[in-house]
Structure formats: C-alpha cells, structure tokens
Amino acid sequence: MNYRKLGNLTVSSVGLGCMGMSQSYGAPADKKEMRELIAAAVDMGITFFDTAEVYGTPDDPHDNERLVGAALAPHRNKVVLATKFGIHFDMSLLKEGKSPIVPDARPAVIRASVDASLQRLGTDHIDLFYQHRVDPKIPAEEVAGVMADLIKEGKILHWGISEASEEDIRRAHAVCPLTAVQNRYSMMARTHERIFPVLEKLGIGFVAFSPFANGVLTGAYDRTSAFAEGDMRARMPQFSAAAMAENAELLTLLRKLAAEKGATSGQIALAWMLCKKPYIVPIPGTRKRARLAENAGAADIQLSAGDVAAIDAELDRMPMSAVFGEVRMKK
C-alpha cells in the first residue's frame, strides 16, 4: 500500500467504504466476519475507513458506526476514521415519488450527531467528519462555523462535504478549510471532474465513492445477474439487461487494459482515478477478503498520463448506459 494526502491528512491510497456491510446489498453481513475483514484491511495497509450515522440495519439504524468502531478499536491510533452527519430518512416520501433523504444541518442537530457518533464509534475524536448532503436551508458558512468550533473542542480533526458543488465548497472553505469532498465518481460517472480545478486551487482532497459504479466495472455481472431481496442494485439502471449490452464496449476496454497490466478490470477502474490526480482516494466497499486484497492491490498499478488521457478519450467516445447517481433531496 502507498499513501497520499487529503488536504494535510495522510490516508492510504485506497480506503474501505463500510456501508455495504450493514445495508443496501441484501441482508446485513455477519458481524464477526466483517470485524475480521476490517482487521484484514488494516493488515493490508489500509488506514482510511468510511461510515456514517445513518448506515444501519433494520434492527439498528446506527449499526455500521458501532461495527466499524469496535473493529478498529485495537488499531485506533493508526487509522483514519471518517463518518458523516446531516441527513435522515423519511420513507413516506417514496409514496410521493420523492427521495427519502432529508438533509438537516441545524447546529443543534450537528452537535447531537457528533456526540452520538463519538459514543457509537468508541472514540474521543473523529478524524474526518463529513456533511452527508448539503442542506439548502442552512448557509454553508453556518455549517462551517460549527465545524470550526468542533475542531477547537477536539471532537473532530478535519471536515468535509459529500455531494458538494463548487459554490458549496468555496463558501464553506472560506470559513473553515475543508480537507476533503466526497462525491460519486467512476468511469461511468464523471460529472464531478468539473470541480477538480477548485479542489486543486484550495488544496482539498477528493474521495470517490461508488468507484465501480456499484460493481458494474468489476466485470463480475452480466445481463443474467440477479440480486437478493433488499439489494438496491436490482433497481439501478446500469444493471438492466439493456444497460449491460450498452456497456459491453466499456467492459471490453477494461478487460483489455487489465490483460495488458496483469490486473483485473476492477483494479484498472481504480488505478485510472488514482493515476489521474494525486489527491483522489477511492473507497470501494466489499464483504469479501479476496476482493479487499484486489482493491488494495490497485494502488500499485501504474498508468501513465498518456494512458489516462487515452482512457478518457475512449470514455468520452463510447456508448454508456445511465448509472445510478445523486438523488434529488427534499428541499
């Protein structure tokens, strides 16, 4: 494993997104197995772990923070623990055809969230505290002011925003410097490349979630793939039979590049972004130790600037299906 900087925070070049251990991909994973997986990640040199207060199971809506905190307790002094605040779910909105994600960044809510997360994680500080989604009702400057206070109090060391626009970034950073922005990013979802110039100018890192487009880019799925009950991929556009046909050229390109580099398709999907910018850190999730090792190995794959440019040119040219992306939030 090698390491890079998000702002002035040093993390492993590949992190571990932990949401899928508790939710969204069928039944929750076995807790003992996931604790062992997280320990294995530490042994592989992964130091960057991502969770959130709202990642949970039907029995415990905050399960993921408890799981991750317990697993990392023996390693706490050598890992970077990231969690998130600022949303809750209102499932009744689904009946109205709306997103169930409701942003809430009122200062009192933020303070309650940080204290609850510290308790669930079993730690005295959070290394990186993200605003999970921008709240249009609360000015960015007000949220940043609360973050500055939490840093002074020692409850958090760094802060960031997830799914942020350039305006959000500039306004927040002017009050309390951001360490990272976490947005959806993959070969199939590149719209956030437009904020790279401002990140470079301000010295902010970029954390890429869903770097495999929820698994499509690993090449492990085809038009016959079926998903378990409760697996959100069953409803994602990129997994339909028509989409798989539409994405055939992209998957062929990945297999070709993988063969040339002695790698896997998934490793190429990660190496592409790692070699594109030195401040990009992907956080793929997994429940499997073999996939974890494969993802960690992507940090050692070298693509030249010419390789990356050639891949980008191909991505710009080729047909590609719709991909599950940012959802509209309740205003």
Model-predicted regions and their roles:
Residues V134-V323, V327-K331:
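Beta/alpha (TIM)-barrel catalytic core signal, keyed to glycine-rich beta->alpha loops juxtaposed to Asp/Glu
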Residues A40, M44, R120-L121, G154, ...:
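Structural motif
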Residues N77-P103:
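Structural motif corresponding to the early beta-alpha repeats
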